[in-house]
């Protein structure tokens, strides 16, 4: 931290707080051990989340980053949606910005997107896990979407957030699959 401060970057740790709102996963992708290792989705209550956010604001944090193993699944077992958590965090006095960690694209509904778009404190950056541009590979991976469905969610996000940033991650097992994904992304 001293080296960061000497370069004028020391306050970076004061600006952001990472708020874990969800743990576990029920998706069972073929390559992933998380459902076995971490168990089913468990979401924190909105009251618990907002209490932590208020504490972080009192410590000087102005930007909250909502994180989870499968953030898009937030609330599924307690009758809530990710949009509920976003609205709750955005409503806390002193919060200037809210960011989201990686999202599963197929779990975002039009209602979720509309509710998110109404939150002016939400940064319009969405990291959507693509994994592969190949339908066959996605099916073998037990991902629950196709490249066309992924593209559709990108279009819906861009309609609601015209200047949004979309980032992704991919996995390439073979040269052929890497080529398919590269061609899809271009």
Task: Please report, for each region that a protein language model flagged, where it lies by residue.
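Pocket-edge positions in alpha/beta enzyme catalytic cores
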Residues: 4, 40-41, 77, 142
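Canonical Radical SAM [4Fe-4S] cluster-binding loop centered on the CxxxCxxC motif
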Residues: 15-47
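Active-site glycine- and acidic-residue-rich loops that bind
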Residues: 42-47, 106-110, 176-177
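Conserved SAM/AdoMet-binding glycine-rich loop
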Residues: 58-173
